[in-house]
Amino acid sequence: MSQGDDDKIPENVLLASLDDMINWGRANSLWPMFFGLSCCFVEMMTSFTSRYDVSRFGAEVLRGTPRESDLMVIAGTVFKKMAPSILRLYDQMAEPKWVISMGSCANSGGMYDVYSVVQGVNQILPVDLYIPGCPPRPESFLEGLMLLQQKIRSEERPTRPVLRMQGGTQGTVAPILVDGATKSRDTRGPGMEGIAIRGSAMQPPYFAAPRSDELWRPKQPRLPYPDFNLQAELQGAFAGQVVLDETACDMLTYRAPARLVPELLRHLKERKESPFRRLEDIACVDESCRRDREKYKDFTVNYHLTCFDTPGRIRIKTELEGSYPEAPSITSVFPVANWYEREAYDMFGIRFAGHPNLRRILMPPDWDGHPLRKEHPARATELPPYTAEDARRQKALPAGDFFDRVDDETLILNLGPQHPGTHGVIRFVLKLSGEEIVDMDSDIGYHHRAAEKTGERQNWHQYIPYTDRVDYLSGVQNNLAYLNSVETLCGIEIPDRAIYIRVMLCELFRIANHLVWLGTFASDLGAMTPVFYTFTDREKIFDIVEFITGGRMHPAWFRIGGVAEDLPEGWQEKVHSFLEWFPGRLAEYEKLLSGNPIFVARLKGVSAITVDTALEWGITGPNLRACDFAWDLRKKMPYGGYDRFEFEVATAQGGDCYARYQVRMEEMRQSLSIVRQAAAGMPGGRFISPDYRYTLPQKRDALEDIESLIHHFVNSTRGISPPKGECYAPIEGSKGEYGYFAVSDGLHTAYRMRIRTATFPHIQSLPVLSRGWLVSDFLAILGSLDFVLSDLDR
């Protein structure tokens, strides 16, 4: 058509190039895969709900398989154990295809320069677009989607490839980058190569003569704890070989030789009065870098047990010698010890004689070394660059190797490590007879990002943001779990106002966690409606959280000794508005689901367990209370000021999937009551402790008082130095009991930071919960536990 003929074109005719037409269709009809790695995926999924409504951009239909998808959003941390699966998914996607890297961890490794994390997905995949943030907000994801659409429309020339001709461009054309060659090897950015990274007593570079020892500080305060009338009893039963550790300050502690540990634990478990019925954790410590090395053997193994009749805990310590020592397994006493012993073997190289299947649990089967030993590198940048070739060479354990080979005509079914029903990266291997589950096992560690090793590298204040990302659906509860141990170790008194602020925010996050659980759990069972409403209510909570803290999922707002800042003006109105809004919504959810015969039939009687079984397998929190066992740390062993609030412990009968649902519904109601009490009774005064040996001073104090200014400078640069000692003081988290075993050698970083999470034993218990039920029941059983993979793998 010649120029000047435009006026001859009818109004209902549009002229465009074939490139433009193809790009228009593709840009406005993207097919993202249902695929998520970490925290960023939650914010990505939030963009699909009603407040943000991604359907406006033609990308709302998530595809369950890679063969139906053309957009992969790498939402979260890229783990080395997961990298081979990511590559396989990408290779199976339809052409043309595009990749969005969402969040700092996917972009560059972010704050996780750790041995288990790939320092940017661009080392194994080509990337079209990077979205910054940790995690990015839903609005950021929507902007990234629009920018990708713009890129497709303006930069691609797909006609020739579509017509099977040479030339043209479509899909991702960016190169895969090589760490240290085409991208910076240093996480601090270009130009930093050769400049030493600050270290600690355990990690290079070493600093001579730490000044921490020149500062006077009191010893770790001794807490009042029950002695359970054990000393004479153990003296008689073990002929003086079990010795009271009089240096322990946080709980009753005894030392015993390794050979006696199984017998000792059985004695404690089966005693008539005040038995210790549950093993909480096994926490190992590599003692090779202690400053007073002569006082320690090579390794210490700590067994934490709980008594319910007389609420309290006991720690049993045993010392081991040698580079790769051995201790007797206690799986015959406490079945839950199975995974804890495997973890100790995986991370420390400690063997357990008599263990039924001692193999790695978090790291890939071919991993070299044991990451929590002091000599193992902490940083990814201390290891050789990770490439796509490394990922392709790495092989997962074959499904058939999880069970004894028996010719019984059973079927092995892989579920994961990428499946919409697992809500993250985990692999379940089911052994089926027809559709009945006769056995199962779990392959975990796909979300392991070295949270414990990082605790030995960051100073005590710097570590707070890392705690946010352990149970990334529970926000500031993570901070409180960590600070409860650190503040107990230091003997810090928390101001009343800070106590109330903490409790109010923790209970808001408990509701937020349960809302995500409720919506996704109902969705797993086929009820699509609730998730869109529960996320709307969660956004109302996040409006409050963001107004007070400035953050959403990861506020990192609690501080040692209090909180980061005082409450802003106007907080009461926002909290009151939610308190008025939510009870009616909760009643609607209950009416919608509890009155739904299909929902009830899918859950009632399914996966029922007794209290004894729950305690044997270390089950805590709502899943334990669903067995009609009223154990809640906020009531039974109060911490953080919870003894100032009136609330009921939510329980249910039956121990089945439906009872777990009932407990969480009632917990939201009780949390609402606690928030109401905290808001109404909010005291005045300071928001952080004036004990500036351990806290960051309020700004006004640092500006007016030279002593406070000095403390601010020291504590914000080098970091605080708690007294030598150790403390384990768990909290009642959203998913169950959650605590940090903090070990201090008197320096500005923790010597050992062990994290006990609720999800770890809960997922271990799945074979007990699932045997005899159908494949169709499995996702209901799994979802009823309320788990998150970062909580599992740490």
Swiss-Prot record:
Q: Which Gene3D superfamilies match?
A: 3.40.50.12280, Cytochrome-c3 Hydrogenase, chain B (1.10.645.10), NADH:ubiquinone oxidoreductase, 30kDa subunit (3.30.460.80)
Q: What is its main location?
A: membrane
Q: Which Gene Ontology terms of cellular component type are present?
A: plasma membrane
Give the catalysed reaction(s), semicolon-separated. Answer: a quinone + NADH + 5 H(+)(in) = a quinol + NAD(+) + 4 H(+)(out)
In this chain, the stretch annotated as NADH dehydrogenase I subunit B covers 1-158
- Give the subcellular location: Cell inner membrane
Uppermost EC category:
translocase
| Alphabetized PROSITE patterns for the sequence | COMPLEX1_30K, COMPLEX1_49K
Q: Which membrane topology describes this protein?
A: Peripheral membrane protein
**GO MF terms held by the record:** 4 iron, 4 sulfur cluster binding; iron ion binding; NAD binding; NADH dehydrogenase (ubiquinone) activity; NADH:ubiquinone reductase (non-electrogenic) activity; quinone binding
Enzyme Commission number(s): 7.1.1.-
Q: Where is the region NADH dehydrogenase I subunit C?
A: 232-387
Annotated region (NADH dehydrogenase I subunit D), positions in chain: 414-794
Keywords in alphabetical order: Cell inner membrane, Cell membrane, Membrane, Multifunctional enzyme, NAD, Quinone, Translocase, Transport, Ubiquinone
The organism's superkingdom is given as Bacteria
* SUPFAM superfamilies hit by this protein: HydA/Nqo6-like, HydB/Nqo4-like, Nqo5-like
Complex and partners: NDH-1 is composed of about 13 different subunits. Subunits NuoBCD, E, F, and G constitute the peripheral sector of the complex.
* HAMAP family in the record: NDH1_NuoB, NDH1_NuoC, NDH1_NuoD
Q: What does this protein do?
A: NDH-1 shuttles electrons from NADH, via FMN and iron-sulfur (Fe-S) centers, to quinones in the respiratory chain. The immediate electron acceptor for the enzyme in this species is believed to be ubiquinone. Couples the redox reaction to proton translocation (for every two electrons transferred, four hydrogen ions are translocated across the cytoplasmic membrane), and thus conserves the redox energy in a proton gradient.
Give the family, as the similarity comment puts it.
In the N-terminal section; belongs to the complex I 20 kDa subunit family.
User: Which protein, by its recorded name, is this?
Assistant: NADH-quinone oxidoreductase subunit B/C/D
Organism equals Citrifermentans bemidjiense (strain ATCC BAA-1014 / DSM 16622 / JCM 12645 / Bem)
